Amino acid sequence: MKKTLAALIVTAFAASAANAAVVYDNEGTKVELNGSLRLIMEKADKKVYNAANQSTKKANSALRNAGSRFGITVKHNLDNDFYALGRLEFRFDDTTSRDKFGRLYAKRAYVGLGSKATGDITFGRQLTIADDLSQAVDYEYGFIPKSEYIPTAGTGVVRYDYKGIEGLQLSANYNFGQTNDEKGNPLKPGIKNAYAVGALYTVGDLDARLAYGHTNFETGASYAHRLDGVLASLGYKFGDFTLTGDFGYGHEKLDDAKVNKFYVAPGFAYQVVPASKVYGNYLYERAKGESDKVKTHGFLLGADYKLHKQVV
């Protein structure tokens, strides 16, 4: 089955910078409040073609929330270069309404212990290293399907990060069982457990990233459902011009059924003037089972303008 998605999206996106305001700083304890208001006005026309080359057209327009959030970060210095840290972040998009401003919910909530020499370990509702495994400029649209290969977040995650070498970040995480997302919506299928390891490396104009993850899903039966995924991302700057490439490979097994899938997503970004850039991305994804094959094509073109140092 071949699935082609052609979309024209005209948007106006406004986001205030997530600047932090220090509300307390005394005796080794620092408390910061931060947040941003993110609104998007969009008009979208979309065509989906099926295997018989028949198209279905949908149109949509909205002025909506695009991930507005606020949070509090706490850090307390301990003895011997160690420190305790924690973060609580709230968002508003727990709703089915078109404006996406709904009930407040906790998107992130974690605590941990860290040291510059040995790294940080954190526990709770947080991102995993897989969230950093893309460099495409796609803002709100989540163009790169990396979360379908390795979970990019979880409600019960233990994560370790080491940044003791300049330009290098090493990370590992373990996800405990999860049957609902941060909003309380059921995951289908639920996650029994998962783990991932990854590395981010920057030197000069080169940005290279790599991660591997293994996920076991809930089945409610004696057979297993698991997914092994590899993500990679490369970026290189040529002055004001940046080329990126995001890649993913996954091998999924449900009982005796197997699916192999991959995606390739080249992209670019050009800083036309200090306040504005243009960008574009292309996505090709293929999933092949024992009796069927699904191909997906997608593209995204955009431009942004920085009206103020705190408004894009």
Describe the residue ranges of each PLM region.
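Gram-negative bacterial Sec-dependent N-terminal signal peptides
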Residues: 1-21
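Glycine- and aromatic-enriched membrane alpha-helices
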Residues: 22, 183-188, 291
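Gram-negative outer-membrane beta-barrel proteins
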Residues: 41-49, 92-98, 129-133, 178-182, ...
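Detector for outer-membrane/organellar transmembrane beta-barrel domains
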Residues: 189-300
